[in-house]
From Swiss-Prot:
Keywords: Activator, DNA-binding, Transcription, Transcription regulation. It comes from the Bacteria. This is Probable transcription regulator ArfM. GO terms for molecular function: DNA binding. Induction: By fnr. Autorepressed. InterPro entries: cNMP-bd_dom_sf, RmlC-like_jellyroll. Activates, in anaerobic conditions, the transcription of the fermentative operons lctEP and alsDS, of the hmp gene encoding a flavohemoglobin-like protein, the nitrite reductase operon nasDE and the heme biosynthesis genes hemN and hemZ. The keyword DNA-binding applies.
Length: 158
């Protein structure tokens, strides 16, 4: 895909619904591409950024959970997710990041994204809607962490 293809792809995402093409183009120009391989460390999602999966998928897994339920988050082509400067909600050393070998992610630094949001209120609304969706994911992660912690702290035979 070339820049024009990426621009058209991004413009079709709910995040950029009713957002002028010029703003989407500015975000694309100021973003960087992360091309990955399998079994990334969480540090490849290292900065205060908004990430957009352009190709492949990224899976966050908790090694403490039983086989079959280790996946705590999965982002695929077209998904948008924010990560703070310390890896956001995935600070646990038990969380691993697995990306498909063909992964391509657009990393948009948050300060640039924030500046663009100040130019267009619809982008702000779309970003808030995306955060609301991620709050549910965060809550699920918290519940899993809490449940696992309680199991680890339980008295034998209780």
């Amino acid at each position: 895909m070339n820049q024009c293809d990426y621009l058209l792809f991004l413009k079709q995402l709910p995040m950029f619904n009713e957002v002028p093409l010029s703003i989407v183009e500015t975000l694309l120009k100021n973003g960087t591409f992360i091309r990955g391989s399998c079994d990334q460390s969480p540090s490849f999602l290292h900065s205060q950024s908004v990430y957009i999966v352009l190709k492949g998928s990224v899976r966050f897994m908790d090694t403490r959970l039983p086989e079959g339920s280790k996946t705590v988050a999965l982002w695929e082509k077209g998904d948008v997710f924010p990560i703070d400067e310390k890896g956001g909600l995935y600070l646990s050393p038990f969380i691993s990041v697995n990306a498909t070998s063909d992964i391509l992610i657009l990393n948009i630094p948050y300060y640039i994204f924030k500046k663009m949001m100040s130019y267009h209120p619809q982008l702000q609304m779309n970003f808030l809607a995306m955060l609301q969706q991620n709050v549910f994911c965060s809550y699920q992660l918290f519940l899993r962490y809490l449940h696992t912690s309680q199991d680890e702290n339980a008295e034998p035979g209780s």
